[in-house]
């Protein structure tokens, strides 16, 4: 079983030392869902919400979220992010959000991909809550990662 890298033997948290690691190309893809009524899905994808066109706003929020990850998640290293994409896929009962993040660095970008999805999902929720108070954010997870000492990984 792997040990937690952010916790010392005495239980105290610390930022992992990555200064001795080699830079490699790294990517991570994450997804999440915002479940909502079908009529709200139609409003969301036709830019018909009372608050306006939510998807472009949520895309920018997701990109900003990825860039701000080390500011809001303790112990995350600041990374030079080379590429961030946030995409939305229409479902009958909501939207699937997928974020992809890429860097050339000494640590992975899974947290940045998760933060991009989370921030985009929160923004969608904020913009639909007036018309669907029962909306739910769900299923946020990493789908894949590449690069680094531990190698490539995918849910498939």
Curated annotation (Swiss-Prot):
Q: Which InterPro entries match?
A: MoaC (IPR023045), MoaC_bact/euk (IPR047594), MoaC_sf (IPR036522), MoCo_biosynth_MoaA/MoaC (IPR050105), Mopterin_CF_biosynth-C_dom (IPR002820)
In which pathway is this protein known to take part?
A: Cofactor biosynthesis; molybdopterin biosynthesis
Task: State the family named in the UniProt similarity comment for this chain.
Answer: Belongs to the MoaC family.
Q: Which organism is it from?
A: Corynebacterium glutamicum (strain ATCC 13032 / DSM 20300 / JCM 1318 / BCRC 11384 / CCUG 27702 / LMG 3730 / NBRC 12168 / NCIMB 10025 / NRRL B-2784 / 534)
Describe the subunit structure. Answer: Homohexamer; trimer of dimers.
Q: Name the domain of life.
A: Bacteria
Q: Where is the active site?
A: 126
Drop me one GO molecular function for this one: cyclic pyranopterin monophosphate synthase activity
Its EC number(s): 4.6.1.17
What keywords does the record list, in alphabetical order?
Lyase, Molybdenum cofactor biosynthesis
Query: What role does this protein play?
Result: Catalyzes the conversion of (8S)-3',8-cyclo-7,8-dihydroguanosine 5'-triphosphate to cyclic pyranopterin monophosphate (cPMP).
CDD domains cross-referenced by the UniProt entry: MoaC_PE (cd01420)
* Name of the molecule in the record: Cyclic pyranopterin monophosphate synthase
Where is substrate annotated to bind?
A: 75-77, 111-112
Q: What is the lineage of its organism?
A: Bacteria, Bacillati, Actinomycetota, Actinomycetes, Mycobacteriales
